[in-house]
């Protein structure tokens, strides 16, 4: 290119053409202040081959009066056709780079200086940056094409020039004296390597300072995965199993690695920060963050695994955004392979997402690669984020933990526990979730839709709506080593090899998942929408007079302040009236005025949707609501009987709602809640008896509304036990009982107008039945048929007649007694 007058002529024409658009300047250090020795030859070192970078350098040298890089240079008897070289050599005719070779020009210059003591040469490292630094750029469009650590193709370089070329910056660094390198007397080859290493470190440090650190491990890690012993073993087994060459199995493992691995770039993080800052301000009234300081304290020296609840696709972006804004490293995020869509998938991958298939079953090679990838992240200290619920909660409840990722984490820690692992629960609460209407359709029976790139237009359409505030609460961290010490005290003394899979692993992983879920619920953010939904959905007509709703909300706020659920739970500011105004402003309340005042109600469109927001905080009200429900049919109860019934029901409530208290803590909490209910006038204490208010009183209405928040859960319990008792011992399997429960719930929801599709959620019945088995109330026989404890009927009726209306109990018993007819009716 520059070795003949013709090539120099072509290069000059190219430079002039380039500068019809490009504008460049020198940054940091003036080219005139380089303290060059003009009597000695000058060479320019560019990091990698780029004709446009060379043209910009030539332009800046001409402008500054420096020697031009495209002109010949002489060092003693050595005559070089041009005064520049690329630290990374030009590719060969097949496009391959020789990573080990040194630039020929550098080798010849060092040899010339070594052979002639009077000769010297100066090498000036030069970096060309297209556009502003990512930290300074505010345009998301320009950030997409900003300089990064990734290797770019010709098309992307052309787009970069077109979009960012008007702000091109050139950095001249202090010259390196070749004579100083030669005087170390290391020999020619070692001197060349030393010069290369010196410039590589220089270019890397400068690039880090200008565009941010290289936080991607993809380029090196993926190739390293296939050399890990467990992956090599899986490759060999795959080759034998499929009767294919080992090289083909290795190529398959590499494809899996590239499919999985994230490709973090600082520019992508900055792009997302700029876009999301605009997005949050456009769609939300603000983001409230609580307790992040404890994460800032434990992050140094720990492998941090963020385990947020999962309510929206925005969860992926929101947490990374907040961590980045608060000076913490954004995590590598586990995302379903369904999100690896064109355009969106690439952006998420550069923002830290790594993709995983929904199931690993039947693919041991993929399993080995994925496990090794996560193990590498953990042992190298990269923060990681995954959702223990697996998918997004469509009901607003905490879903039962899926323990796959926890099991991988636990086994990785047993392989190498040098870096302490700490789980950080993160509760993300929305006053209005973006996918709310989609969830509503799915709750009503619509099939789950596959994600599509066109879903982004739905988000754009949502920009016109008001979504309130977002609350992000960081919960109590869980130190994995301490958890294992508690669950398996002797784990440190066991032989922990790479293939170590102890007998206690599954049970311990399940307990870990439950602990994470409880810690997430402890960090719940109670917001105005939650409380309004809780109050109105407890009424028979989904409506209350405004003054009555204000009293209910004031009561709930007072109770939660008197008996806090946990130190990590947060409450909304303001009184009941302020909460109503806030929710009204979000168009979630309908109203009707008359001469007596204003009635607030939920219309049909919002009634089901509001069950989602009620369920967010149902666990917080479960215990006081249970206590209140015992006074539905009983005017007075003793403390001992209350405690007996609460202890009997608590294991099932705890399993469904992930309540935080251990059974031995229950009596103290019961007393705290009873004292709070007495203080607010909802109960009256007479010696060891607790007495409800008069049915005609306002306090009785408040007590009844509080009790109704847990009624549907208690109804499901009674349905399952009634079906079981009517069927008889060892008649139904767990699966058959589960199906019958769903059918009965669907029928009762129609008969009693329960407008809550999650009432007949199959997973809730499944988990209740599992808990009955774990508690020893149910006993599967050899054929999987369920037998039950002799006292089950007595206990179920004793509780039900106190917490459920006679009409509802009769309906449940009738449907249970004639379940064949119920089955026929449900099918028809």
Swiss-Prot record:
Broad class of where this protein is predominantly found: membrane
Record pathway: Phospholipid metabolism; CDP-diacylglycerol biosynthesis; CDP-diacylglycerol from sn-glycerol 3-phosphate: step 1/3
Keyword Iron-sulfur applies: no
Record keyword Cell inner membrane present: yes
Topology of the protein relative to the lipid bilayer: Peripheral membrane protein
Keywords noted in UniProt: Acyltransferase, Cell inner membrane, Cell membrane, Lipid biosynthesis, Lipid metabolism, Membrane, Phospholipid biosynthesis, Phospholipid metabolism, Transferase
InterPro entries in the record: GPAT/DHAPAT, GPAT/DHAPAT_C, GPAT/DHAPAT_LPLAT, GPAT_PlsB, Plipid/glycerol_acylTrfase
Superkingdom, natural source: Bacteria
Subcellular location: Cell inner membrane
Any single Pfam family the record assigns to this protein: Acyltransferase
Top enzyme class: transferase
Motif window: HXXXXD motif: 309-314
Catalytic activity line of the entry: sn-glycerol 3-phosphate + an acyl-CoA = a 1-acyl-sn-glycero-3-phosphate + CoA
Protein family according to the UniProt entry: Belongs to the GPAT/DAPAT family.
NCBIfam families: plsB, PRK04974.1
Record remark on domains: The HXXXXD motif is essential for acyltransferase activity and may constitute the binding site for the phosphate moiety of the glycerol-3-phosphate.
Protein name: Glycerol-3-phosphate acyltransferase
Organism listed in the record: Pseudomonas putida (strain W619)
Gene, per the UniProt record: plsB
């Amino acid at each position: 290119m520059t070795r003949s007058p013709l090539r120099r002529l072509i290069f000059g024409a190219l430079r002039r053409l380039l500068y019809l658009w490009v504008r460049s300047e020198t940054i940091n250090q003036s080219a005139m202040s380089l303290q060059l020795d003009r009597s000695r030859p000058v060479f320019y070192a560019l990091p990698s081959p780029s004709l446009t970078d060379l043209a910009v350098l030539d332009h800046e040298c001409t402008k500054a009066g420096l020697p031009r890089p495209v002109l010949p240079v002489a060092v003693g008897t050595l005559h070089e056709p041009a005064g520049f070289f690329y630290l990374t050599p030009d590719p060969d005719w097949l496009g391959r780079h020789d990573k080990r070779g040194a630039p020929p020009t550098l080798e010849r210059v060092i040899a010339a200086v070594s052979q002639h003591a009077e000769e010297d040469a100066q090498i000036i490292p030069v970096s060309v940056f297209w556009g502003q630094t990512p930290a300074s750029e505010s345009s998301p469009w320009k950030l997409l094409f900003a300089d990064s650590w990734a290797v770019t193709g010709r098309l992307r370089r052309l787009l970069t020039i077109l979009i960012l070329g008007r702000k091109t910056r050139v950095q001249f660094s202090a010259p390196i004296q070749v004579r100083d390198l030669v005087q170390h007397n290391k020999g020619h080859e070692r001197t060349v390597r030393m010069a290369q290493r010196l410039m590589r470190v220089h270019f890397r440090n400068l690039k880090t300072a200008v565009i941010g650190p290289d936080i991607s491990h993809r380029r090196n890690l993926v190739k390293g995965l296939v050399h890990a012993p467990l992956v090599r073993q899986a490759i060999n087994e795959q080759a034998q199993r499929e009767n294919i060459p080992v090289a083909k199995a290795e190529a398959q493992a590499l494809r899996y690695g590239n499919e999985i691995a994230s490709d973090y770039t600082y520019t992508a993080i900055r792009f997302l920060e700029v876009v999301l800052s605009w997005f949050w301000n456009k769609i939300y009234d603000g983001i409230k963050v609580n307790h992040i300081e404890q994460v800032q304290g434990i992050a140094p020296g720990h492998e941090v695994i963020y385990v947020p609840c999962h309510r929206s696709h925005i969860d992926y972006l929101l947490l990374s955004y907040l961590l980045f804004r608060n000076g913490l490293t954004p995590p590598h995020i586990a995302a379903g392979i369904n999100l690896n869509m064109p355009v969106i998938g690439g952006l998420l991958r550069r923002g830290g997402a790594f993709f995983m298939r929904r199931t690993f079953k039947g693919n041991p090679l993929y399993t080995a690669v994925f496990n090794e990838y996560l193990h590498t992240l953990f042992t190298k200290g990269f923060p990681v984020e995954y959702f223990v619920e697996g998918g997004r909660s469509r009901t607003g409840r905490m879903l039962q933990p899926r323990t796959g990722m926890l099991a991988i984490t636990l086994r990785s820690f047993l392989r190498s526990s040098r870096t302490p692992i700490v789980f950080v629960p993160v509760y993300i609460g929305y006053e209005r979730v973006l996918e709310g209407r989609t969830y509503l359709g799915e709750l009503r029976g619509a099939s789950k839709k596959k994600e599509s790139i066109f879903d982004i237009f739905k988000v754009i359409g949502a920009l016109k709506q008001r979504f309130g505030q977002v609350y992000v609460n960081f919960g109590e961290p869980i130190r994995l080593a301490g958890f294992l010490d508690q669950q398996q005290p002797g784990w440190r003394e066991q032989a922990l090899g790479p293939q170590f899979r102890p007998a206690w692993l599954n049970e311990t992983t399940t307990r870990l998942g439950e602990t994470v879920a409880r810690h997430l619920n402890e960090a719940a953010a109670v917001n105005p929408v939650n409380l309004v939904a809780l109050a109105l959905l407890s009424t028979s007509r989904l409506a209350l007079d405004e003054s009555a709703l204000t009293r209910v909300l004031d009561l709930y706020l007072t109770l939660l302040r008197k008996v806090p659920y946990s130190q990590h739970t947060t409450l909304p500011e303001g009184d009941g009236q302020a909460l109503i105004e806030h929710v009204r402003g979000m168009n979630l309340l309908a109203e009707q005025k008359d001469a007596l005042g204003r009635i607030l109600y939920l219309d049909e469109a919002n009634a089901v949707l509001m069950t989602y927001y009620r369920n967010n905080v149902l666990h917080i009200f479960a215990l006081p609501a249970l206590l209140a429900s015992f006074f539905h049919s009983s005017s007075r109860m003793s403390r001992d009987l209350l405690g007996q019934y609460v202890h009997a029901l608590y294991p099932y409530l705890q399993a469904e709602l992930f309540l935080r208290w251990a059974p031995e803590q229950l009596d103290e909490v019961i007393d705290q809640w009873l004292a709070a209910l007495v203080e607010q006038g909802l109960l009256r204490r007479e010696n060891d008896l607790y007495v409800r208010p008069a049915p005609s009183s306002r306090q009785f209405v408040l007590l009844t509304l509080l009790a109704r928040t847990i009624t549907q859960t208690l109804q499901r319990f009674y349905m399952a036990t009634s079906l079981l008792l009517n069927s008889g011992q060892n008649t139904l399997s767990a699966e058959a009982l589960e199906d019958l429960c769903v059918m009965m719930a669907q029928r009762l929801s129609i008969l009693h107008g329960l407008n809550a599709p999650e009432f007949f959620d199959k997973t809730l019945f499944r988990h209740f039945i599992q808990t009955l088995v774990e508690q020893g109330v149910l006993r599967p026989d050899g054929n999987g048929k369920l037998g039950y404890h002799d006292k089950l009927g007595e206990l179920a009726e004793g509780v039900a007649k106190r917490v459920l209306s006679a009409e509802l109990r009769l309906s449940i018993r009738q449907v249970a007694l004639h379940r064949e007819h119920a089955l026929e009716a449900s099918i028809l």
